[in-house]
Regions:
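Acidic, Ser/Thr/Pro
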Residues: 1-186
């Protein structure tokens, strides 16, 4: 027997879907995300659909590139991240402005690559931050051609904070799209 569920069937409204201290980020296929980590924060990167590379750049607290903070080896020039940042769309502009505000230079950095074109759906990589750092995670890829079946797919990032109370008092407000021209406090 099928039962139609409605909002009246919710027994405890407003419950958190994730436990305290756990954050979920989605890196869109062909896009990137910038995340700040503290010492001993754990991050799980999940290739949800498979066959999607993950390019990572890590900057230390001084703004210098250092992938070893996540236990990764710097291998390649971050050409995919540079390509995404040079696109003429709103998300690329927003990411570039966040990097500029934090004085992070992608041009001098080396990237680390996780996953491959042969990775399976649901494949996971677990990393632990050794120190305070800012990370750029990208899911690189080209727009799918009409005669192919290989679009860039999303990556899921699950961050487990060691000190969740540190972020409890800070409002979760997104970065502004542009610098404010006039700021008035009332």
């Amino acid at each position: 027997m099928d039962k139609n569920l409605t909002s009246m069937d919710i027994r405890n409204p407003g419950l958190r879907s994730l436990p305290p201290g756990v954050e979920r980020y989605l890196v869109k296929g062909g896009g990137l995300s910038v995340i700040s980590l503290d010492p001993d924060d754990k991050i799980e990167i999940i290739d949800t659909e498979g066959k999607q590379k993950c390019e990572i750049i890590v900057f230390n607290k001084d703004g210098k590139p250092d992938c070893s903070l996540l236990g990764l080896k710097e291998k390649d020039d971050p050409k995919n991240i540079k390509k995404i940042l040079s696109d003429k769309n709103e998300s690329a502009f927003q990411a570039a402005s966040v990097l500029k505000k934090r004085n992070l230079d992608v041009g001098k950095a080396k990237a680390s690559i996780l996953f491959s074109e042969n990775s399976e759906a649901g494949e996971k990589v677990n990393l632990v931050s050794k120190d305070k750092c800012t990370c750029i995670f990208s899911a690189p890829g080209n727009a799918m051609k009409v005669d192919e079946q290989n679009p860039p797919t999303d990556l899921l990032l699950m961050v487990k904070r060691t000190k969740p109370q540190k972020y409890k008092d800070k409002p979760n407000i997104p970065e502004p799209l542009v610098d404010p021209l006039n700021e008035i406090f009332v």
